[in-house]
C-alpha cells in the first residue's frame, strides 16, 4: 500500500524548511546562559547552606578585665559589657549571647562560620575609656588547640567616641552613626556605668536612680540614660508592689522616651513589654514585641519577652516557639537566656531544670530567683527536703528581691512544719497587697499555692481568683499544679477554669503561633 502525504503534512514540512537555522553563535550564547543559570542556582544553594544570609551570632565575654584592672570593679566591667551588647544589637542587628568568662569547651562554636567569640578588655584611664578586645571566628577554632585570638588594642578615648570607634573597626561591617546609647559627657557616662553596676547587683537602687535621673537632665538626647532610668524604676517598683500602679505610667513614659530617641531598641521594648505583662495586659505586650521584632528580627531578648507574655496569657505553643527561635539565635547551653518557666507548665521539666543553673555574677543568681525556682521545682516533684534547702538559701541572700525573700521564707516555714507562723506571715504579706492592684499575676498564683499547702483552701481560692484578675491566664498550670489540687473540687474553682478557658481562647485567636514565622 502506497502512503500519499496529506496536504497539511506537506505544508508543515515546507514551513519548517523555510525557518532559519540557529547560528553557531546563538547556540553558544544559549549554552552559556544555561550554564550561568545552573551555576547561579548552585551558588545560591551553596551560600544558603553555608548560611551567608544568617545573622552574626556574637558570644560576648564581658568581665575579663575586672580581675586584672583595678580601675574597674566587676560590676562596672559587666555594665560596660552590657552597653557594648546594646550597641552590637541596636546598630549591628547581631544576636548576642553574654557570658562572664571564656567557655571552657568551645566545641559548640567550632566550625560556625557566622559566630564570633569576642572577649572585652575595657580599661578606664581618667575619664576616658579604652575598649580593647580580642576575637576569634568560630570557623577558625580547631579541636584540641587554643583559640587563635586576634587582638584589638584600642586607644583611650572619651566614652562615646570609644563606642563609635569599636563599631567602626568591628570585624563585621556596622553602619556607624553617632551613638544614641552612650552619653557624650564622660562624667555622665561613668555615673551611668555605676548606676548600671548597682542594678546588676540589686543594690543602692535609689542612689542609682538619682544618678540616672541626673544623666537624663544633663543629656536629654541620650536614649541610653532614659532606658537605664526606666529599667531601674521598673526594678524598684517591683520591690514595692504598693507603689506599682502609681509608678507604672511614669516608668512607661521613661522607656517610651528612650524608644522615641532610639526606635526599636530591643532592651527598651522588652522592659516596656514586661510592665504591660505584669499589669495583666499581655495583648499590648505582644503587639509591642512583634512590632519591635520587625526591626530587630534576630534579637533573642525580644523572643524572651514574647515567651514571657505568651506564657502569662496561656499561649504555651506560642511561648515554646519563641523559646526555640531564641535558642537558635543565642547559645543557651553557654548561658540560659531566662528561667524557662514555660517548660514547667508544659511538663518539660528537664529543660526547665537546665535553665536554673547558677550564673555567677548574674542578677538571676544574686536576686534569689534561681534558688527559689529550684525549690519550687523540688516541691512540684514532691522532694520536700530539697525544696526546704533551696527555699532557705533563697530567703537568706543579702541582695535578693524583697518579694522572693519573703515568699521563700514563707515556703521555708511551711516545709519546716511551722504552718501557723507561715500563715501569719503570708496573711500579713497578703494584706499589704490587697487593694493595691499589685502587679504580676504569676507571682500571685505562688501565694495561692502557699495558702493551699498550709491548708487554707478559702484563702487559696481567693488568691487564685486574684491571680486571674491580675492577668495570669495559663489555664494548663491552674489545672496541673500539684499544690492547687485541694481546690479542684470547689464550685468556685470550676467557674474560674471556665473564665480562664474563655479568655485564653480569645488570645489564641488573636496570636496564633504562625505570627512568629510571618514576623
Predicted regions and their residues:
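Short coil/turn linking the two alpha-helices of tandem helical-hairpin repeats
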Residues: 195-203, 230, 235-242, 279-280, ...
Amino acid at each position: 500500500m502506497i502512503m500519499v502525504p496529506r496536504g497539511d503534512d506537506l505544508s508543515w514540512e515546507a514551513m519548517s524548511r523555510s525557518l532559519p537555522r540557529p547560528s553557531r553563535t546563538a547556540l553558544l550564547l544559549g549554552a552559556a546562559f544555561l550554564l550561568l543559570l545552573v551555576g547561579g542556582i548552585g551558588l545560591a544553594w551553596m551560600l544558603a547552606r553555608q548560611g551567608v544570609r544568617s545573622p552574626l551570632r556574637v558570644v560576648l565575654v564581658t568581665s575579663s578585665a575586672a580581675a586584672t584592672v583595678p580601675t574597674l570593679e566587676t560590676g562596672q566591667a559587666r555594665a560596660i559589657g552590657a552597653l557594648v551588647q546594646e550597641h552590637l544589637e541596636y546598630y549591628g542587628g547581631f544576636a548576642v549571647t553574654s557570658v562572664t568568662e571564656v567557655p571552657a569547651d568551645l566545641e559548640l562554636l567550632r566550625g560556625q562560620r557566622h559566630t564570633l567569640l569576642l572577649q572585652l578588655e575595657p580599661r578606664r584611664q581618667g575619664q576616658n575609656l579604652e575598649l580593647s578586645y580580642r576575637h576569634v571566628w568560630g570557623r577558625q577554632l580547631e579541636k584540641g588547640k587554643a583559640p587563635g585570638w586576634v587582638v584589638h588594642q584600642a586607644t583611650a578615648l572619651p566614652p562615646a567616641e570609644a563606642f563609635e570607634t569599636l563599631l567602626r573597626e568591628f570585624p563585621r561591617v556596622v553602619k556607624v552613626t553617632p551613638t544614641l546609647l552612650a552619653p557624650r559627657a564622660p562624667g555622665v557616662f561613668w555615673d551611668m556605668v555605676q548606676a548600671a553596676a548597682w542594678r546588676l547587683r540589686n543594690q543602692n537602687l535609689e542612689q542609682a536612680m538619682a544618678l540616672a535621673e541626673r544623666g537624663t537632665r544633663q543629656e536629654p538626647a541620650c536614649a541610653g540614660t532614659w532606658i537605664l532610668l526606666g529599667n531601674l524604676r521598673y526594678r524598684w517598683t517591683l520591690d514595692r508592689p504598693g507603689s506599682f500602679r502609681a509608678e507604672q505610667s511614669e516608668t512607661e513614659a521613661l522607656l517610651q522616651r528612650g524608644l522615641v530617641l532610639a526606635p526599636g531598641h530591643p532592651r527598651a521594648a522588652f522592659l516596656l513589654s514586661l510592665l504591660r505583662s505584669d499589669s495583666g495586659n499581655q495583648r499590648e505586650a505582644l503587639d509591642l514585641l512583634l512590632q519591635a521584632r520587625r526591626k530587630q528580627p534576630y534579637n533573642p531578648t525580644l523572643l524572651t519577652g514574647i515567651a514571657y507574655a505568651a506564657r502569662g496569657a496561656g499561649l504555651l505553643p506560642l511561648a515554646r516557639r519563641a523559646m526555640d527561635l531564641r535558642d537558635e539565635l543565642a547559645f543557651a547551653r553557654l548561658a540560659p537566656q531566662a528561667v524557662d518557666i514555660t517548660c514547667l507548665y508544659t511538663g518539660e521539666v528537664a529543660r526547665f531544670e537546665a535553665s536554673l543553673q547558677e550564673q555567677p555574677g548574674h542578677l538571676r543568681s544574686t536576686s534569689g530567683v534561681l534558688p527559689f525556682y529550684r525549690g519550687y521545682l523540688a516541691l512540684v516533684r514532691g522532694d520536700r527536703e530539697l525544696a526546704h534547702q533551696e527555699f532557705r538559701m533563697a530567703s537568706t541572700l543579702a541582695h535578693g528581691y524583697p518579694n522572693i525573700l519573703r515568699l521563700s521564707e514563707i515556703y521555708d516555714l511551711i516545709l519546716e512544719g511551722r504552718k501557723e507562723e507561715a500563715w501569719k506571715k503570708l496573711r500579713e504579706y497578703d494584706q499589704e497587697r490587697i487593694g493595691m492592684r499589685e502587679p504580676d499575676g504569676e507571682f500571685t498564683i505562688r501565694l495561692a499555692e502557699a495558702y493551699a499547702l498550709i491548708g487554707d483552701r478559702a484563702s487559696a481560692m481567693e488568691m487564685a481568683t486574684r491571680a486571674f484578675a491580675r492577668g495570669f491566664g495559663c489555664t494548663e498550670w491552674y489545672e496541673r499544679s500539684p499544690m492547687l489540687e485541694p481546690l479542684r473540687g470547689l464550685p468556685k474553682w470550676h467557674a474560674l477554669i471556665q473564665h480562664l478557658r474563655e479568655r485564653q481562647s480569645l488570645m489564641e485567636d488573636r496570636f496564633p503561633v504562625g505570627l512568629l514565622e510571618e514576623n
